[in-house]
Amino acid sequence: MSDRVIIFDTTLRDGEQALAASLSVKEKLQVALALERLGVDVMEVGFPVSSPGDFESVQTIARHIKNSRVCALSRALEKDIDAAAQALSVAEQFRIHTFISTSNIHVESKLKRSFDQVLDMAVGAVKYARRFTDDVEFSCEDAGRTPIDNLCRMVEAAISAGARTINIPDTVGYTVPSEFGGIIQTLFNRVPNIDQAVISVHCHDDLGLSVANSIAAVQAGARQIECTVNGIGERAGNCSLEEIAMILATRKDMLGLYTNINAREIHRTSSLVSQLCNMPIQPNKAIVGSNAFTHSSGIHQDGMLKAQNTYEIMTPESIGLNRNNLNMTSRSGRHVIKHRMEEMGYGAGDYDMDTLYAAFLKLADKKGQVFDYDLEALAFMEAQAEDDDHYVMEQLVVQSDSTEGKATATVRMRVGDEVITEAATGNGPVDAAYNAIARATHRTINISSYKLGAKGEGQNALGQVDITARYDDRNFHGVGLATDVVEASAQALVHVMNLTWRADKVAYCKQQMQQTRELGGV
């Protein structure tokens, strides 16, 4: 049996299901490229049959990813498998992941079939998926609550039908490590053809045991772990990729296992997912929390000064978190910026130097000193920009009346090829800015969530504004970063404006295509 544990990332499928607003295709591609740099073996990037948007996302990612295997989910239905195969057909290497429920409560209450009928459906789905690829994964949904005799029968049948990976999910996060490890061990003891497949696990965190259960599973012989960046996912979330990677790296002496994960990309990938998904990382989160390498106790600090490994079992540098406190100013040249970006793991193709340096100089003139987290924030915002932004905010001026609490905002917007200047009042500067932007764009957006955060520390921190907006029965997520909170708020709104404009454009194109089909192609 191999000592390598395959990392199957499902941030863009299971993880995205937890978001208030779906990621755009471009945002999903950003995450996929980051996962490829991170070194995940397999990335599950969507459920193509569920919507045209998911189909497009899977197809786009499949077209761009070269080193990781791209996977799509499907129920044990031919139409689902057809959609997955079609979306994945452009990929260098791909996997079809099909599943069906196996626990008594799911079989009887959800599927309303007998177990034998469900077993036949599973076998049929695996055989059908094998028409498109040799790499088929089969999942026994709610395996943690499935009678062990039934689970053994299902696993043996799926392997015989051609599945090369068998996934054992603890779908509702119900089991404890000794119990879950025992399930995996029993499968190895009782399923005669189990050596013909890789055993995978997919653990949820409802009882806070997803990582512990996954480790127990690999100790029992499983060799694939399904996980997400920052542990995001349904309900309480999934097994955390960064925790699994660092457990296996840090305790290789005990576990004797390894992964292909490039740990120095962990911090960068975690930050990207947090920002794009509008899901802040709790400060005490293992590995990637802001307090993960912070020592407050005097005894601990004294020990750290004497020997770093007295209280650190891993280093910040090992996950790509650089301790270099070099401050950059408007006098710093391009070579300094390039050097700092390289040290943070960014290649020349990850950003445009002209755009980044211009933004850096503008920020340095405002702040004086610019830090690593500022550069990362600027690179992040550059990546969000679309070539075809319909709305561009060129200038924003706000005046406030401190006595009455009223404010006036004047905004100059480029709307398509036209430049428009509008002014409006509001209850405070942010409200005034939003009213002015609405006038300039003739687009009304209902804000359902507004979050103000910070990138960095103290008075030099950048303001980060995340908004969720409701438009045409869909949620859209916008983000803005600036030294000024009002400007960051305006940027977030303009970001959402562009997303909704593109959504309208896509809907119109689909309508035209439908009308063309109805007219027989005329």
UniProtKB/Swiss-Prot annotation:
Mn(2+) binds at residues 14, 202, 204, 238. It is an enzyme of class 2 (transferase). Pfam families: HCS_D2, HMGL-like, LeuA_dimer. It catalyses: 3-methyl-2-oxobutanoate + acetyl-CoA + H2O = (2S)-2-isopropylmalate + CoA + H(+). Keywords: Amino-acid biosynthesis, Branched-chain amino acid biosynthesis, Cytoplasm, Leucine biosynthesis, Manganese, Metal-binding, Transferase. The keyword Amino-acid biosynthesis applies. Coiled coil: none annotated. Gene3D superfamilies: 1.10.238.260, 3.30.160.270, Aldolase class I. One of its GO terms (biological process) is L-leucine biosynthetic process. One of its GO terms (molecular function) is 2-isopropylmalate synthase activity. Residues 5-267 form the Pyruvate carboxyltransferase domain. It is found in: Cytoplasm. The keyword Amino-acid biosynthesis applies. GO terms for cellular component: cytosol. Residues 392-522 are annotated as: Regulatory domain. Its EC number is 2.3.3.13. PROSITE patterns: AIPM_HOMOCIT_SYNTH_1 (PS00815), AIPM_HOMOCIT_SYNTH_2 (PS00816), PYR_CT (PS50991). Homodimer. NCBIfam families: leuA_bact, PRK00915.1-1, PRK00915.1-3. Belongs to the alpha-IPM synthase/homocitrate synthase family. LeuA type 1 subfamily. Catalyzes the condensation of the acetyl group of acetyl-CoA with 3-methyl-2-oxobutanoate (2-ketoisovalerate) to form 3-carboxy-3-hydroxy-4-methylpentanoate (2-isopropylmalate). This is 2-isopropylmalate synthase. It comes from Shewanella amazonensis (strain ATCC BAA-1098 / SB2B). The lineage of its organism: Bacteria, Pseudomonadati, Pseudomonadota, Gammaproteobacteria, Alteromonadales. The gene is leuA.
